[in-house]
Amino acid sequence: MKKKIVTFFILLVSSLPIAAQNFRVGVTAGTNVHSSTNIDARMGFSIGAKSEYGFNSLDEGWYADASLLLESHAWKVDFGDLGLHLYKSSRQYTTLWYLNLPIHVGYRFPVSQDVKMLVNAGPFVGLGLFGTSKYEIVFMDGNTEKGTIYDNIFTAKDALGRKIQNRFSWGAGLRFGIEVKDKYQFMLGYDRGFNKFSSLFGNSRMNLFSASVAYMF
């Protein structure tokens, strides 16, 4: 029994350098545009860390990709004058900050000596941290009024007592792009939310288009 335990630990320790060769971490940052029914997109941002594990090798073939991102989702809603003819326009601006965790599986294949193509897809989960909602009204005389509707929209409720903004989000995403010199990654992405992110809009599932860069160590 002792020999089996010793043999197990020897095999485990000897495999660590191989596993380390197939694993690496990096940093990433990017921009995104949040689109959904009844809202107008605004630009958001993301920053965080990521890791990769090559099932056989990080040079090519199948790999796993996971990131931990601080990400903002922003949009606006234009209400016009609501038919009251009291002002020229009225808008609501909302910015949310999430901690997002996408876990993808992808494939890497060489295009040239220094360039590789990357494609990956998988689920994500998000936790809403904080967010504000503000308004802007332009009156008929040209004067403008600005103010805050919700200081933290994740804790706010509507007139029926419903949460206005869901704190948790989940869905699936797709990424594709290139890697240069095994260090620099340039990616385009799309994420689709499977749950409603707001009670104010009927079909409020997230559609997030993104562009990002990463540096792998």
Residues of each region from the PLM?
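Sec-dependent N-terminal signal peptides
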Residues: I5-S14
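Extracellular loop and loop/strand-boundary signature of outer-membrane beta-barrel proteins
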Residues: V33-N38, L86-Q92, D158-R162, K196-L200
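Outer-membrane beta-barrel transmembrane domain signature
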Residues: F55-S57, G61, A74-K76, T94-Q185, ...
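Transmembrane beta-strand segments that form the barrel wall of outer-membrane beta-barrel proteins
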Residues: V25-T37, A41, L188-S199, N203
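Sec/Tat signal peptide C-region and signal peptidase I cleavage site
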Residues: L16-A20
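Flexible, surface-exposed loop regions and adjacent strand-edge segments
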Residues: D81-Y87, Y135-N143, N203-L208
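Outer-membrane beta-barrel "beta-signal"
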Residues: R205-F217
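Glycine- and aromatic-enriched membrane insertion/assembly motifs of diderm outer-membrane
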Residues: R24-G26, H34-R91, W97-L99
